[in-house]
């Protein structure tokens, strides 16, 4: 994941140097097609199919409606949607979401394993993951605007500078993985998110006369903290689930990541709607606060024992 994250901004900068911005989206079409056929060819079939369990379109539609309404309500405030529509969306989200959760709790093979959230250390790891990925997406979406409006970088320069964040993760994440057996993952996650929060706060209050190096070390600080957090948190989340439920746990891990990323992007839009040009600084400030909350959540896991 870190290598792909490094390649993303660099490739985007290269594409923008020779083509217009629509190509940033068009390039994903052939990549997606190739990935689809590679997945069909090399990924193993789900063993559940052998047990006679079929894909449930009803569950899929309820899942899409629940998360779609949730994200839509968060984003609606940034698009001047009438309050009555927003309230209607919130009520619909509560009703459909409640029905969906109750249905999932009765399923033997649920699409989302809400029953695993009854395990304290598992649920705390999910919360920590959501907070951290929300903060990460707040930062990654807001930073290009900060670099373009405050520091007047072009698209190519912005992409190259943004590479410094994931580049550090490439080196830090494997080291964090090696420390999992020696240091409690809650400590690694707490320290990592604290470091990331320092980087976010430094970017939020960055002076306008800051040069390239000043920007790079702040971004690298964020990447270092996130890299130190991610691997230990993933390990603790997966290992806290029963061995026969690791597949379900990995699904919840991906869901937590996507919820955080989607909410983070929606919050940036909301901040731009509320605060205009100062939104990038406010987004970095909010990201710093969320990472501190995530650090606290991570450290709280020190008092919770792993399930037997």
Task: Please give the residue ranges for each predicted region.
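Helix-loop-helix hairpins in multi-pass membrane proteins, especially solute transporters
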Residues: 1-58, 243
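ATP/adenylate-binding site constellation spanning eukaryotic-like Ser/Thr protein kinases
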Residues: 8, 30, 66-67, 185, ...
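Membrane-embedded alpha-helical segments in integral membrane proteins
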Residues: 2-17, 42-44, 65-76, 140-144, ...
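12-transmembrane solute porter fold
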Residues: 18-19, 27, 35, 84-89, ...
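Flexible interhelical linker loops that connect adjacent transmembrane helices
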Residues: 36-67, 105-120, 181, 244, ...
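Membrane-interface helix caps and helix-loop-helix hairpins in membrane proteins
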Residues: 47-51, 76-82, 208-209
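A generic secondary-structure micro-motif detector
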Residues: 1-2, 103, 133-134
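C-terminal membrane-cytosol helix-exit motif in multi-pass small-molecule transporters
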Residues: 29-48, 64-76, 92-107, 294-302
């Amino acid at each position: 994941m870190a290598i792909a994250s490094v390649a993303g901004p660099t490739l985007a900068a290269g594409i923008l140097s020779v083509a217009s911005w629509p190509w940033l989206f068009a390039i994903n079409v052939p990549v997606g097609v190739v990935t689809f056929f590679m997945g069909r060819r090399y990924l193993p079939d789900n063993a559940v199919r052998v047990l006679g369990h079929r894909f449930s379109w009803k569950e899929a539609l309820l899942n899409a409606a629940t998360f779609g309404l949730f994200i839509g309500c968060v984003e609606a405030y940034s698009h001047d949607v009438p309050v009555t529509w927003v309230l209607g969306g919130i009520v619909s989200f509560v009703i459909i979401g409640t029905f969906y959760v109750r249905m999932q709790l009765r399923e033997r093979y649920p699409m989302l394993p809400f029953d695993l959230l009854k395990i304290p250390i598992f649920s705390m790891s999910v919360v920590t993951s959501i907070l951290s990925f929300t903060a990460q997406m707040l930062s990654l979406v807001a930073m290009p605007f900060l670099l373009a409006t405050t520091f007047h970088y072009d698209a190519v320069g912005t992409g190259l500078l943004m590479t410094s964040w994931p580049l550090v993760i490439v080196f830090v994440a494997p080291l964090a993985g090696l420390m999992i057996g020696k240091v409690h993952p809650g400590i690694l996650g707490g320290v990592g998110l604290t470091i990331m929060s320092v980087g976010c706060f430094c970017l939020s209050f960055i002076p306008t006369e800051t040069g390239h190096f000043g920007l790079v070390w702040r971004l690298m600080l964020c990447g270092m903290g996130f890299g130190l957090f991610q691997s230990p948190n993933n390990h603790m989340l997966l290992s806290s689930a029963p061995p026969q439920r690791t597949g379900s746990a990995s699904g919840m891990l991906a869901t937590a990541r996507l919820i955080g990323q989607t909410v983070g992007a929606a919050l940036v839009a909301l901040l731009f709607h509320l605060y205009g040009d100062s939104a990038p600084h406010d987004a970095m400030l909010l990201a710093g606060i969320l990472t501190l909350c995530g650090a606290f959540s991570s450290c709280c896991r020190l008092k919770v024992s792993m399930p037997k």
